[in-house]
């Protein structure tokens, strides 16, 4: 089955705006101990969320390709989530729906793909090795399986270092949205060698 062509969503007119919106500023101030009760409480508050959704700007940059898009991420239950990517003109490029044991992806031509591994499928179909399984935790400001991380002066994640399957990801958080409780990440950047993934969250709805 031919793979979908994502070239046309690269370098569209709003791409420069997306990159500007995704710039990351490292939080200032001394870091806090990962053993602090405030950090444990923050993690518990985030894990207690049953449903959440966020939307914003997405950028993937490597030597091979550059992709800029809008994204919508929604989780409706344990291991049940939806990821939507649209180009800067508003057209849907990719829709991924995941539930336990079944993942479906629909491309811009309406072609449907199924798998039991969302991370592997999105990598093969788009050429973007997005660490989706870990990103589901990182986007919430949780370390997931990572044990090497730092906190900011408000007992929230500021940086993660994580190695898996030959990838060495570094995640830097540029700020948090304090209008939601608990506070949720406002922007973040993932890097692995020459690859960069930037996310800027416009807003969060949490339950």
Curated annotation (Swiss-Prot):
It is a lipid-anchor. InterPro entries: LolA/LolB/LppX (IPR029046), OM_lipoprot_LolB (IPR004565). Keywords: Cell outer membrane, Chaperone, Lipoprotein, Membrane, Palmitate, Protein transport, Signal, Transport. It is found in: Cell outer membrane. Its main location: membrane. Transmembrane segments: none annotated. A lipid is attached at residue 22 (N-palmitoyl cysteine). Monomer. Plays a critical role in the incorporation of lipoproteins in the outer membrane after they are released by the LolA protein. Belongs to the LolB family. This is Outer-membrane lipoprotein LolB. It comes from Escherichia coli O6:K15:H31 (strain 536 / UPEC). The lineage of its organism: Bacteria, Pseudomonadati, Pseudomonadota, Gammaproteobacteria, Enterobacterales. The gene is lolB.
């Amino acid at each position: 089955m031919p793979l979908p062509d994502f070239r046309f969503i690269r370098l569209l007119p709003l791409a420069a705006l997306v990159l500007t919106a995704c710039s990351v500023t490292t939080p200032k101030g001394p870091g806090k101990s990962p053993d602090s009760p405030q950090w444990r409480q923050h993690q518990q508050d985030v894990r207690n969320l049953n449903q959440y959704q966020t939307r914003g700007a997405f950028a993937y940059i490597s030597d091979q390709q550059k992709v800029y898009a809008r994204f919508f991420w929604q989780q409706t239950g344990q291991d049940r989530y939806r990821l939507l990517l649209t180009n800067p003109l508003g057209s849907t490029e990719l829709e991924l729906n995941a539930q336990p044991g079944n993942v479906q992806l629909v491309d811009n031509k309406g072609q449907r793909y199924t798998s039991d591994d969302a991370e592997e499928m999105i990598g093969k179909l788009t050429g973007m090795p997005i660490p989706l399984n870990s990103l589901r935790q990182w986007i919430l400001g949780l370390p997931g399986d990572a044990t090497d991380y730092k906190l900011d002066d408000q007992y929230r994640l500021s940086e993660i270092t994580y190695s898996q399957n030959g990838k060495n990801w570094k995640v830097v958080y540029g700020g948090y949205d304090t209008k939601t409780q608990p506070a949720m990440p406002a922007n973040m950047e993932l890097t692995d060698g020459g690859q960069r993934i930037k996310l800027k969250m416009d807003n969060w709805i949490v339950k």
